[in-house]
Amino acid sequence: DCAVTERYGRCICCSRQQASVLSYHNGALREYLSEKLPEYMVPQNYHFMEQLPTLSNGKINRKQLREDFKEETAVIRFSKATTETEEKLLDIWKQLFGYENIGIEDNYFSLGGDSLIATRLISEVQKTFGCKITISTIFENLTVKSLAKAIEQSEQKEEDTLQIKPNLEEAYHPFPLTDVQYAYWLGRSGLYELGNVATHCYFELDADGLDTECAETAWNLLIQRHGMMRVIIQPDGMQRILENTPQYHIDVTDIRQLEVTEKEKALDEKRAEMSHQVIQTDEWPLFDVRITKIEDQKHRIHISFDNIIFDGWSMFHLLNEWAEVYRNGKAEMPITLSFRDYVLGLEQIKSTSAYEKDKKYWEDRVETFADAPDLPLAKNESQITEQRFCRRSAKLSQKEWQSVKDAAGRLEVTPSVLLMSAYAETLRLWSSNKDFTLNLTQFDRKQLHPEVNNLVGDFTTLTLLEIKNAGNNFAERTKAIQKQLTEDLEHTAYGAVELERELKKKTGNMRGAIMPVVFTSGLGVEQWNEGKWLGKLNYNISQTPQVWLDHQVVEMDGCLCLFWDSVDELFYPGMLDEMFRAYTGLLHTLAVHPEIMQEKTASLVTAEISEKRRQANETAAEFEEKTLDGLFLEAADKFPDKEALVTCSRRMTYREIKEEAFYISGQLKSMGIKKEETVAVFMEKGWEQVVAVYGILFAGAAYLPIDIHNPRERVEKILRDSGTRIILVQNQAYDQDTEWLHEWDCISVSG
């Protein structure tokens, strides 16, 4: 006898034990059914029973079946280890997957395996067996039995294996930023287009009956426990953990007496202020926590994190830990290992043979590397001076998400890759280039020490993933993505930030965003769990410099949360809404009808959306090729004596600006300025800025505006990184403690 039922979207085959069934284990039974059934109909789990529960009328009691079915993904009757290697490896799998009943025939992907678990598995195998395996080894040997054989046949070697030790004596000495941190730090400087914003994340939590004093005490205990909550970034680009910091005070605003509309206005104003903050990095703290008391028992917690020091896992971990400390009244002891120890350990990797091998792997592909998706833009990046990110969000229910994960398992790809493939499928409908590169954000903690997983910090790594429009159907394209990503993840010693520098050199796009379409997977890291937080999530948004669109996926309470954070000003009105509807619609369809993955003509969009996409891509038009300085000269010829500029110190006509700008142009040419060479404008706001910019353009050079209020070290960094040798200054600015500028050739603009 047999019954098939469903729990959270998983197909469960329940059978009364018979001789013909007892001889099967999970792997063999699945293999047999795979030969008889379409892939999407093969049950994911098998539950053997002595007797099927029935109702009084003799029919099968399906409700009781679901209650009897245990929440393990693995089967109850499983194949046990037969060798020492299998036994040790099985223990590792149980630890990583969190299941006790795992057999040596159980499938890695069916258990929920992904690339993050694979990374940890590689580390554990190296510790236990003293051999090096790769992600490809795991994905080609998806059972304990098969992987154990691969381990036994591998070479026992430990070259280039790094371990780190806590250095307590130098714990508060400066240390370098990681490559990703440094990219974030430069991105906020304004040196690049779509810069001038911090890498930032903002949360709002609604809490009932919050004790604000206890919340503040708990937050301060976390500050004592985690060194990176006491970090600053010095003007020279080094970071430093402070040994001691003042008691952090959480500002509490009481709006209980306000009318409903006034309360909403006050909360909106606070969100507008905090959701896109650019926190000063050379001053502590690099976070901002406030509380609004809305009613006697209702509070809203506002949390602003600078992601240059906290990655996604770290933020979720802090929110979990904050609530735990709040309820228990105490925090665990400070961690011996520090993020400084970890970063210095990463620096050692650059001197290994693995780094040189991975560098060659990536640099050999630079010349043929695919561009980012070429999406229709309403504006050029350079036209946006202050970008604001907007969020679109959707959710897959527990049942839908489990169904999608099961579909990924049957396809033998990770859930992240399946989501990434659906994202790419959507982008391809709007992008003019069908082969493109996505920028993947990952939280990769290299297991250099047992305490690494207890640290908070920015462990973010980036991977540039080329996605080809190859394959007859969605399933084939998804498996191709899995294959490419698997290969790429075996060459992570050389980072994507370094690769982007090489790509910028190839394209000549030194100031623009080169890979601005991002996919961020939070799967496999600490889940969003509102039950563990101080309050229920009310709102959340993130931003990153030089990013157009960032798609983030995270699990919360068994559901899948989907977020698109985007610079909407870049795109045509309504376009991103249509794209997001197409994407989420595909995922909902996949959850109900996973068989469409095999269809050659599967369509993601309705005819209406397809037509709008076609219209959005019709961007061909005739434009006059006019430049900023060319337009000015036209106006100066037409209206030479018309007033063009008014400041508090001077009024100027077009003729006067033109004459003074040509004078500056002549000075630059006499100094040997080259076409498209960068000339810095280092001034307070004033008429001199206008003259300086036109003077530079008339000379055929490019101008680089620098905020005069930036710290000296940052200005010097920008000047050196941009290759600038000439700076235009004002008399008053040049006289104010700027002797250090004498390293460069300076021209003073004065009336």
Spell out what each predicted region is.
Residues 1-66, 71-341, 360, 377, ...:
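Carrier-protein-dependent adenylate-forming modules in NRPS/ANL systems
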Residues 51-54, 237-238, 295-296, 380-381, ...:
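Short, internal active-site loops enriched in acidic
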Residues 40-42, 190-199, 227-228, 283, ...:
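His-Asp-centered acyl/peptidyl-transfer active-site segments
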Residues 94, 98, 187-196, 241, ...:
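Flexible, P/S/T/G-rich "lid" or insertion loops adjacent to the active sites of thioester-utilizing
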Residues 536-557:
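Low-complexity, glycine/alanine/valine/leucine- and proline-rich hydrophobic stretches
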Residues 74-75, 345, 387-390:
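Extracytoplasmic loops and strand-loop junctions of Gram-negative outer membrane beta-barrel proteins
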